[in-house]
Design a protein with these regions (language model features):
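N-terminal secretory/targeting leader peptides
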Residues: 1-88, 96-99, 103-260
Length: 260
């Protein structure tokens, strides 16, 4: 089974996907093996999701906003300040909300077998942003979804939807003044080398990374192994949550020095 990982995926995401693959292989006594193809080799998030829906790829990983293009109800997850905590956000997709999403996904020909996450997003900027008024006129890169664009417009900023890979150059060239993502991304992508000198903890949105498995691949798993398979995938997702927390804690410590 091939699982695709996007080009801008954090290192801990790829590591967690491989942990999940190892857990699946062990739990099924080698009956199910997952080959994680990282680095966007198989295409971007939208491309690989399309491949999974068409049955040409076993597992695609993407931001929840990408899947929302097919499941409009998921757009609610892009709303600003939706969750108070990571536990609250994770509970939602592990229970009723997750079941509803999977019901919709199955009509597309895919199964959502787990959720990794990019987690809460914060703001990185060239000038300190300490109050809501400081957002006025700031050109900030956001994800390509209406929820984030609307949120930052309401703050008084000028949001610009750019692909993740374009952020560094846009900061360098002055096309944008700020960007937003998980705080660890500021360091993974070395935005401080492109002029970022301030990190503002906003936690304005929470981003999931659903694992979408094609019907073709799902139907190849023996019925007596399906539950074991999904449990192992979820165990890998929970490991990724921990990896992300550790990376963000380290980034928070670095950000304290950046802001000083």
């Amino acid at each position: 089974i091939n699982a695709a990982a996007p080009a801008d995926q954090l290192a801990q995401d790829a590591a967690a996907a491989k942990e999940a693959a190892a857990a699946v292989e062990e739990a099924t006594d080698g009956a199910i093996k997952i080959d994680v193809v990282a680095g966007g080799t198989l295409g971007g998030e939208a491309d690989t999701l399309d491949m999974a829906i068409q049955g040409d790829l076993a597992i695609a990983t993407c931001a929840n906003s990408v899947l929302a293009n097919y499941i409009p109800e998921m757009a609610i997850l892009d709303q600003a300040f939706l969750w108070d905590s990571q536990d609250q956000a994770n509970y939602a997709v592990q229970n009723e909300l997750g079941a509803l999403i999977n019901e919709k996904a199955e009509k597309l020909g895919i199964h959502v077998i787990g959720y990794m996450e990019s987690g809460f997003r914060d703001v990185f900027s060239k000038k300190p942003i300490q109050t809501i008024d400081d957002f006025k006129g700031v050109k900030i890169r956001t994800m390509q979804n209406q929820g984030q664009l609307a949120a930052f417009t309401s703050f008084g900023a000028n949001p610009v939807a750019l692909a993740a890979g374009e952020q560094f150059t846009a900061l360098q060239q002055g096309t944008i003044d700020a960007c937003e993502n998980a705080v660890s991304n500021c360091w993974v992508n070395k935005f401080y080398e492109a002029g970022v000198n301030s990190v503002t903890t906003t936690h304005h949105s929470f981003v999931y990374i659903p694992l979408c498995m094609s019907d073709n691949a799902w139907n190849q798993i023996p019925d007596d192994l399906k539950e074991t398979f999904v449990e192992a995938v979820w165990a890998g997702c929970e490991q990724q949550w921990q990896f992300l927390n550790e990376a963000n804690e380290e980034a928070d410590r670095k950000s304290t020095r950046l802001n000083s």
